[in-house]
Amino acid sequence: MNIGIIGLGLIGGSFGRTAVKAGYTVYGTDINAETLEKAQLLKAVDYVLDTDNAGKLDVLISAVNPSDFSSVIMPYLQFLKKGAVVMDFSGTKRGVVEVMKRFSESYPDLFFIGGHPMAGREFSGIDKSTATLFNKASMIFVPVKADIFVLDKIKLFFISLGFSEAVITTAENHDRMIAFTSQLCHVVSNAFIKSKTAREHFGYSAGSYNDLTRVARMNSDMWTELMLENGDFLSEELETLLNNLGEYLEAIRNRDRQKLKELLKEGNDVKELIDQRRK
């Protein structure tokens, strides 16, 4: 299988390294010439992707910000062979899916599937890419135009790269869930670390501090775009969180032992219930 990747940062670079290691042939490109050179040195790509060799691809993946999807994919579409699959790896889906729908009308011989590998690091760039980033990760698929045979083939391809499970959903549900499981976590971590006490934490912190602050480090350009793209769902989650925090604050300020105990027990019980369901 021949794979094309546009955008060779942390995600695109890691995916390329994983695919090359698994024995697939990877064609890749990046707007940054230095990144492309590093990708070749790190064995994230076998060949540089261009319109001359795009016809060899079985799968073409965009691993750039959602706002750039249309402009980076469009030049290659007319050169792809019949039955090729076009995917994206962006962190929000509604906007990209609408673009895919338009492209699918213009290119009826191609298949289009939105994708989101649920893996990442607090760092960015090809330098931080690894061939193990996706081990046991979940892969989310948002089919736009793909029959069951194509979807099964793509699922098996991702499983062969080390992904542990495949989730098929809609763009709307993807964005609703990601607002909670990913974007809200980054906002909370980023806001938490702004406490003046953070600069004095050395010697006073352990696992809980490290867990909560890991994703405070982020690519601010990318995350700004993702959060604003998903602003409706993220705003709802933030409002819920602020209301919940307000209850804790009130109980603590009022030294209301019973209320605080109830709040803490509620959170503990919800966590235990969720963990049991996961098993």
Question: Model segments located where?
Answer:
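Interdomain hinge/lid region at the active-site interface
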Residues: 200-270
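Internal alpha-helical scaffold of NAD(P)-dependent oxidoreductase catalytic cores
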Residues: 131-214
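Residues at the starts of beta-strands that form the adenosine-phosphate
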Residues: 2, 25, 111, 138, ...
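Rossmann-like NAD(P)(H) cofactor-binding subdomain of soluble oxidoreductases
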Residues: 74-127
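NAD(P)+-binding Rossmann beta1-loop-alpha1 motif at the extreme N-terminus of oxidoreductases
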Residues: 1-51, 59
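Rossmann-like NAD(P)-binding element
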Residues: 51-80, 84-87, 91
